[in-house]
Curated annotation (Swiss-Prot):
Expression sites (tissue/organ): Expressed in roots, tiller buds, stems, leaves, lamina joints and the young husks. Expressed in embryos, coleoptiles, radicles, leaf pulvinus, ligules, panicles, palea and lemma, anthers, and the internode of the peduncles. Expressed in young leaves, root meristems, florescence meristems and young spikelets.
Gene transcribed to yield this protein: NAC4
Pfam families for the chain: NAM
Taxonomic lineage: Eukaryota, Viridiplantae, Streptophyta, Embryophyta, Tracheophyta
NAC domain residues: 12-168
Region (Disordered): 304-333
Name of the protein: NAC domain-containing protein 4
Biological processes, Gene Ontology terms: abscisic acid-activated signaling pathway; auxin-activated signaling pathway; ethylene-activated signaling pathway; gibberellic acid mediated signaling pathway; regulation of DNA-templated transcription
Further details from the record: The gain-of-function mutant plants Ostil1 (T-DNA activation tagging) exhibit increased tiller number, enlarged tiller angle and semidwarf phenotype. Overexpression of NAC4 shortens plant height. Plants overexpressing NAC4 exhibit early leaf senescence.
Induction: Up-regulated during leaf senescence. Induced by salt stress.
DNA-binding region: 109-174
PROSITE patterns reported for this sequence: NAC
GO function term, MF aspect, one: DNA binding
Composition bias type Polar residues, residue spans: 311-332
Length: 343
């Protein structure tokens, strides 16, 4: 009792924590408790772990924020047996893994057993985050502490153990991509900066670009890479549509038409030329039809030479304005283009 009072009167400097090693717990605390049951330590309380639930132990401890230490007498499951009772009112402690040897100067002095608390009853108990390290004496130190130095052996039924109890998190980490996304999300939520390489990698892996062209109505031929690689950003619907010989064949159904042959030849010679530019240079759909009917090659210069003759026609409804800008009659041009594709 005097020893406990002397320890209680110690004034430790701020910042000191009770964080002993396994060997220190055995030799400086448990061995003294086994040798003398009246021994009391400043940082280690006494508790019956079979009558206390793990979540109640922090309030019974003398000190500790994340780890709590207790002296405990082993509770025998049967009066005449040596099996330890590990059950509480809400669950039970289950041993896991192998016992660890604890040495002092190459001499075996104790053993450490790891136990996990399960709620409910075995074998259908639910695992919790509460973990306990149970320390017991072993070897010559055990024999000495059990009372051989006092001339009488102690009963193994009253065996003292020292327990360290703490709680672990049961949150499982996901896949590698989930970790990176969680880290980036947390950093963004805190307003912090993240690595650009990690952010770019996640962005590139999560974004799926849509196809540039609809291949459902295309013919058997392959699509020209020069055509598919071009991405337009025009606000006008007509400006973004470029000539595609494969698509023309797919809609036309064959190569027998001289108009389609001329169009195919033009598409092979002038990649990247929009339909609007073609229509304007030839004064619309009528100019294209006349050029195809006459067997001439579809050259922009030739189409420009026929501008005055074709502008006099009232069937097309197009003006002879040389201004390349699209006028307010864009709806009519869209109708001509629809007729062109359905030719």
């Amino acid at each position: 009792m005097e020893q406990h009072q002397g320890q209680a009167g110690m004034d430790l400097p701020p910042g000191f924590r009770f964080h002993p090693t396994d060997e220190e717990l055995i030799t400086h605390y448990l061995a003294k408790k086994v040798a003398d049951a009246r021994f009391a330590a400043l940082a280690v309380a006494e508790a019956d772990l079979n009558k206390c639930e793990p979540w109640d132990l922090p309030s019974l401890a003398k000190m500790g924020e994340k780890e709590w230490y207790f002296f405990c007498l082993k509770d025998r499951k049967y009066p005449t047996g040596l099996r330890t009772n590990r059950a509480t009112e809400s669950g039970y402690w289950k041993a896991t893994g192998k016992d660890k040897d604890i040495f002092r100067r190459k001499a075996l002095v104790g053993m450490k057993k790891t136990l996990v608390f399960y709620t409910g009853r075995a074998p259908k108990g639910e695992k919790s985050g509460w973990v306990m390290h149970e320390y017991r004496l072993h070897g010559k130190l055990h024999a000495a502490a059990l009372g051989f130095l006092h001339g009488k052996p102690a009963s193994s039924k009253n065996e003292w153990v020292l327990c360290r109890v703490f709680k672990k998190s049961l949150v499982e980490v996901g896949a590698a991509g989930g970790k990176k996304a969680a880290v980036v999300t947390m950093e963004m939520a805190r307003g912090g900066s993240t690595s650009s390489s990690v952010a770019d990698e996640i962005a590139m892996s999560s974004v799926v670009l849509p196809p540039l062209m609809d291949m459902s109505g295309a013919g058997a031929g392959a699509v020209d890479p020069a055509t598919t690689a071009h991405v337009t950003c025009f606000s006008n619907a007509l400006e973004g549509q470029f000539f595609n010989p494969t698509a023309v064949h797919g809609h036309g159904g064959g190569d027998s038409s001289p108009f389609m042959a001329s169009f195919t030849q033009y598409g092979q010679l002038h990649h990247g030329v929009s339909l609007v530019q073609l229509l304007e240079s030839c004064n619309g759909y009528g100019g294209l039809v006349d050029m195809a009917a006459s067997g001439s090659q579809l050259q922009p210069a030739a189409c420009g030479g026929e501008r005055e003759r074709l502008s006099a026609s009232q069937d097309t409804g197009l003006t002879s304005d040389v201004n390349p800008e699209i006028s307010s009659s864009s709806g009519q041009k869209f109708d001509h283009e629809a007729a062109l594709w359905g030719y």
